[in-house]
A protein has these predicted regions:
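Secondary-structure end/capping motifs
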Residues: 181-242, 246
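Short, Lys/Arg-enriched, disordered terminal segments
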Residues: 1-3, 251-255
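A local structural motif
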Residues: 24-32, 115-125, 248-253
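Pocket-lining segment of extracytoplasmic ligand-binding domains
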Residues: 124-206
Length: 255
């Protein structure tokens, strides 16, 4: 029986997708491409076995296990998770949150209360049904941030803001399973991710011409930090500690 994998087709996951599709493990897995929020819900309800999961949703998954030392993280500006606003930070009174990712929404709430010292009204926003208003304030994630972020007069990189606040890198998503998997399969899965990381230049081809090829490669190599290092684990633990009680970490770490 194939292992069911929920993956995300944002540019920042391109190396992972390339690795899983072009490694021998492709014969052992069934990949479905969904949004971050759907990836999390599929692991929560048991319709997927592995997923690249926004970190705010990981504690909601029963028997969650982080199974890889690869992640979607940032040691500096991430460029693809942004607060984009028509007004300066201290004037923001309403902030629209992307329903595709629980992590960016929770990060916005934590930074608003503890670092930015603002108290906006938060409202969900469905980008597939509504158009952006450049006079308003939004959290943009993934390819939407890369495409539309530069249109706004005030842009704040969420990873940079977290680093200013905590002096720790930020982790946006990890590879998680909701069940115990054979160690040999996990090793092969990680080898596939490693193969993708070794082929970043090839991995971006599916996103051209939507993104300029050189820009896409530079973004993946400069803005995204894929190694789930000790500092990133510390940053992730700190993020979970600031979350509501129901999101306190109950997660088993890989290794």
């Amino acid at each position: 029986m194939q292992v069911r994998v929920s993956a995300i087709s944002y540019l920042n996951t391109a190396p992972f997708v390339y690795g899983l599709e072009n490694h021998p493990i492709s014969k052992k897995i069934e990949i479905e491409y969904v949004t971050p929020a759907v990836s999390a819900s599929k692991l929560i309800n048991g319709t997927s076995d592995i997923g690249i999961i926004p970190v705010a949703s990981i504690p909601l998954i029963k028997n969650a296990r982080i199974i890889s030392d690869y992640c979607i993280g940032a040691d500096g500006a991430v460029a693809s998770v942004l607060l984009c606003s028509g007004k300066p930070m201290n004037e923001i009174d309403k902030l629209y949150l992307d329903t595709e990712s629980r992590t960016s929404a929770l990060l916005a709430r934590i930074l608003s209360e503890n670092f930015w010292k603002i108290s906006p009204e938060f409202s969900d926003f469905d980008f597939s049904k509504e158009e952006l208003d450049l006079t308003k304030s939004y959290i943009l994630i993934g390819d939407k941030a890369l495409t539309h972020g530069g249109l706004f007069p005030h842009v704040y990189d969420m990873a940079q803001e977290w680093i200013k606040y905590k002096n720790l890198p930020f982790v946006f998503a990890c590879w998680v399973s909701n069940k115990e998997l054979n160690p040999s399969f996990i090793a092969e899965f990680n080898d596939a991710l490693h193969f993708g990381m070794a082929n970043i230049e090839k991995s971006v081809e599916r996103f051209v011409p939507r993104f300029d090829r050189d820009y896409a490669i530079r973004y993946l190599k400069t803005n995204i930090s894929y190694n789930l290092s000790a500092d990133k684990r510390a940053g992730l633990s700190e993020f979970w500690s600031l979350a509501p009680d129901e999101l306190k970490s109950k997660v088993r770490w890989f290794g």
